[in-house]
């Protein structure tokens, strides 16, 4: 076969270049905050930082904002801190009320705007009020007590009435009030006893003391009481839970405290020292949740022996316990502990007292039990009214929380900023813990009403470096039908959004750190990471 000359300038055929970059997925941290497990062996669905992002079943979602609802209360031009927020639920919703306490007075802020003085000079020493509702054949009442002020009631018919002097045995040192088995019960400041109204279905009359010192095995005094409805494995009943300041919890069953045959102690358990001020417990899902130095203690597990001081890992706050418990210890004697459930956001919130100038809350998804933290909400006193969160500020304003798009929206609808969320996912070896990796790109995926703004980095070698600055976000707005221009109008509907970010990081383990701003309802679903694998050295 004759030789064939090569064609000039022909490029020899080359083999295809091998792929050097590998792609891996980082799931959304739907498991929530995890301060419990080793940083080197954490579930990739957990987070080391999760702020203002509520973990759900599919992703983590930006919380809603907060806005001023009622103007500040001022005395001689100086704002008066809102120390309590509470409500009255009337038989007719038209007569519902929202009240707040400041400067020794009670104000009506139902309509928002300028507060109206409802009671002047209550005598309260710190404006810390404890309230509950009680209906009798005569009327529906709000029962309210405060050290220094005594015992007050409110109803649509009679308004605010000071009952302290008309109830035999009542003093102005009364601290808390609750209703159990058709009786009104009280605790007094620094007292080991509890007090109950002699007559059932009565808001006045005579109160009788009942000693509880024998159950306070660790000392202290009775801090509060709460009604707990449960079947306890036998039949549904209402139990009286008595909580001591040093962590002793007694559970009583019966109907009439005047007779041992109809009122008995079922047992005494230990939950660890509890906060000394504020409402540090809540009822939720047929259970009572108590904040203490052992975490968030559910009465159902305490009662059945599943939770104890030696077995705290079964508690709902087990994954945040190592950070949460020291905060309970250090802030125990401070005002403004609040625990409440906000149904509209599906969260149970533990609001801590302000620490210096830092306001912080821990929030648990009530469906999944996963935790996150909230920042940027200056909650001082709080109450959930009609499913909505109301809270008071140190600057005298009353606000609505977890509502609206902006944080800090003024009462005249000016100012405010979009909620800033922050996340650092668990460190991940991406299947090769012994190989060095060069992380070059990351692509987060979001779902929401508008594309969020984000900044991110990849932290390596167990670092917690922040992102450079915070992202800016501008609401794209939405067009109104009939006025929008065809092919130019913006219609806000939920959609998925993604984009590549340069990372330039080198290490054996990688962790996505990201800040984002956007509209409430924006969820972070996952991220893809592009990296080049190296050797062991």
What are the language-model segments listed below?
Residues 200, 246-248, 361-365:
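Beta-propeller blade signature
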Residues 113-117, 158-162, 202-208, 257-266, ...:
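Beta-strand initiation motifs
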Residues 238, 242-271:
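Surface-exposed extracellular loop regions of Gram-negative outer-membrane beta-barrel proteins
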Residues 156-180:
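Asp-box/WD-like beta-propeller blade repeats and closely related beta-sheet repeat scaffolds
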Residues 2-114, 122-138, 271-287, 293-537:
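Beta-sheet repeat architectures centered on beta-propellers
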Residues 101-102, 146-147, 188-189, 244-245, ...:
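Structural signature of WD-repeat beta-propellers
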Residues 177-223, 228-234:
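Solenoidal tandem-repeat scaffolds enriched in leucines and small polar residues
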Residues 69-77, 115-122, 160-167, 210-216, ...:
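A short beta-strand motif characteristic of beta-propeller blades
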